[in-house]
Amino acid sequence: MLNQMKTYPRSAYAKVGGIVYFARMLDKIRLHSAHRLPADYHQNLGKAFDGRCSRFLRVDYSALCERVLQGGTDEEILEWCFVTGRRPNEEEILVWNSFMRKRGWRDEEDGTTKELENYKAQSGLSHRQDLLTLFDYYEVDEGRKE
């Protein structure tokens, strides 16, 4: 269910350096450190999409957390990722963004579609046939979209 009193990370659609999800991951790290991240987000810290994003940039998630907590802008932290890990090219970013924005849609082979359906059911959103991806689900569940 929607809870406007919770503090949520930014939209997964938000981009830093043209890369979706990165801003959300940084927000989750910061909110967790400040004890403001909702408890149901804790189990996936450094896993799931966080893990995918850190692997895409080839940085260790725990090292990234340390860097985020040292301070700096999202852009500075992304540049640290590029230096520490790798700097994806324009085509790799396009593939990443397209892949991430569509997670949950027709992803039966790895269980992501079922996971999305479970999240929707837990949030009372099973009736929402327009929520085809996890990104779309986050938008509604976190109150950015109706």
Regions found by a protein language model. Give the residues of each.
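Polar/charged low-complexity regulatory segments
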Residues: L2-Y41, F99-E146
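Alpha-helix initiation and N-capping motif
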Residues: I19-F22, Y61, D74-E75, I93
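Amphipathic alpha-helical packing elements
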Residues: P38-F82
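Aromatic-residue detector
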Residues: R52, L94-W96, E115-L116
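Short alpha-helix boundary/capping elements
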Residues: L57-Y61, N89, G104, G124
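Charged interaction scaffolds used for protein-protein
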Residues: D74-R87, L94-S98
